[in-house]
Amino acid sequence: MSDLDYLVIAPHPDDAELGAGGAILLLKAQGARVGVLDLTDGEPTPHGSPEIRRQETEAATAVLGLDWRGNLGLPNRSLVADLPARHRLAGQIRQLRPRFLFAPYWEDAHPDHVAASALVDAARFWTKLTKTDLPGAPHYPQRIIYYFSVHLRLHPRPSFVLDISPYLEGKMQAIACYQSQFIVGRPTDPPTILDDLRQRARYWGWAVGAGYGEPFVCREEIGLRGLRDLV
């Protein structure tokens, strides 16, 4: 397959949609090649199963119009950023050759999310190594962009907020594909978890003078080629 422009790496199926669903839809509308790599299958959960999660992931993938989606098969609930996991992730990145990586924000209550963030950091470094048994040629993604799919009530200070106003409904549709996670067994009285997600997007849109937004963080400085697209 052709190289990807962006690879969103997620601890579980649904995290990419939660933290970067609007960005994915925007990038696809701009003609970018976008993929998602789920590190685990997300199971066990109270109302899911491996088969249910596969079906939900396929439905969300269709909504997002992804160019590629895969699963690294690492263990849910006990994800660790160890050397075997780093080797597998770095090898996958070298094969897909994305220009940019998206990863979960490093501060979270969920140990899988913390481990996933550290794993992406380490794997990115490994992707450029020579004299190694990693598959593919050396490759080094330009930036890691961190998205927020967190279990803490943080008030982040983002590096930038992306205006996702035209893509908010598509993002919500993709999230709603994961009924076992966000609908089945959840309270039906408003505000529901989907209401909460919409309100968060509205807040970040309001913060930058737009309708709806998604916040992102970069540890490295971000360069601009112009100011035309500032909100």
Range-by-range predicted roles:
Residues 1-9, 80-231:
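Metal-dependent de-N-acetylase/amidase catalytic core
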Residues 1-96, 217, 229:
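Active-site rim/loop-helix segments in enzyme catalytic domains that contact anionic ligands
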